[in-house]
Structure formats: structure tokens, C-alpha cells
């Protein structure tokens, strides 16, 4: 059962990555591609390179928050983790299909909040801080 869940988890992670690429690449590079400053393939290569660099260098604190601060790390069983990934990917897929830009971060946090609500372990004080930052950030 664990091996099957690992295979499903890898498939779901690929599904999420595909949808992150569909969502975030357009937002980040759409104007440059639309104005013909760069080609789509160049945008894709830049997205991969800088996505990896950002994850490796400055993404660690976000990973810590997402993996153990919104809900306790113990809630992330293999099944719960696959479910969170699936709902993140499914939400992004729907927004991609309708051409609506969606924040990957907000979508992933929303899926984790769902886990926290279902398990009764949501860190509400931290969510207040996160939602406040979402409201203030565009200003």
C-alpha cells in the first residue's frame, strides 16, 4: 500500500508541477512573450532555472511554514500529503483551464487549511498573519 501511495504521490506532484508551470509562467513571462521580447521556450527555461534557484535559496522558510506551522507536521501523513497536493493541483488546473491567474501559494495554503480544519489542528493565529499579509501585500 505504501509503494502504491508513493507512486500516486509522485504522479500527483508531477500534476501539481505541470499546473504551477501553467499558472505561474504565464503570470511571470506573459508580457515579455506577448511583446515578443522572448520566446515561449526561453520563458520556460528561465522559469525552471529561477524557480529552482528561488526554491533552493529563499524558499526554505516558506517550506518550514507550509510543512509544520500552519498545521502540525504530524498531520502530514502520506495520504494527507497526497490529498493536499491533489487539491492544490486540481484548483490550479481549474483556474488554468479558465485562464484565470491564481496564486500557487494561496492555493497550497488553502489546501493545507482544509487539512487543518478537517483535523481540528489549524494554527488560527498564524493564518490571521498570513491572510493579513495577503491583504496588505498588493498595497
Name these PLM-found stretches.
Residues 9, 13-15, 19, 43-55, ...:
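Alpha-helical transmembrane segments in multi-pass membrane proteins
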Residues 1-7, 47, 55-81:
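Helix-loop-helix hairpins and the membrane-proximal interhelical loops
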Residues 21-30, 75-86:
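Hydrophobic alpha-helical transmembrane segments
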Residues 57-68, 97, 101, 122-125:
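Transmembrane alpha-helix boundary signature
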Residues 31-38, 110-122:
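Interfacial segments of multi-pass membrane proteins
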Residues 122-139:
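Structural signal for the N-terminal portions of transmembrane helices
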Residues 21-29, 37, 98-110:
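Short, non-helical or kinked segments that cap or interrupt transmembrane helices
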Residues 37-48, 78-82, 124-129:
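Membrane-interface alpha-helices at helix entry/exit sites of multi-pass transporters
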Amino acid at each position: 500500500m505504501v509503494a502504491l501511495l508513493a507512486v500516486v504521490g509522485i504522479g500527483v506532484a508531477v500534476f501539481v508541477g505541470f499546473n504551477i508551470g501553467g499558472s505561474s509562467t504565464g503570470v511571470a513571462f506573459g508580457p515579455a512573450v506577448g511583446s515578443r521580447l522572448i520566446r515561449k521556450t526561453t520563458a520556460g527555461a528561465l522559469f525552471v532555472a529561477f524557480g529552482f534557484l528561488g526554491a533552493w535559496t529563499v524558499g526554505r522558510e516558506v517550506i518550514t511554514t507550509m510543512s509544520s506551522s500552519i498545521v502540525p507536521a504530524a498531520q502530514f501523513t502520506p495520504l494527507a500529503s497526497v490529498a493536499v497536493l491533489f487539491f492544490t493541483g486540481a484548483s490550479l488546473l481549474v483556474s488554468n483551464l479558465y485562464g484565470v491567474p491564481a496564486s500557487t501559494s494561496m492555493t497550497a495554503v488553502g489546501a493545507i487549511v482544509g487539512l487543518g480544519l478537517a483535523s481540528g489542528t489549524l494554527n488560527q493565529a498564524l493564518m490571521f498573519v498570513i491572510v493579513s499579509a495577503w491583504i496588505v501585500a498588493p498595497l
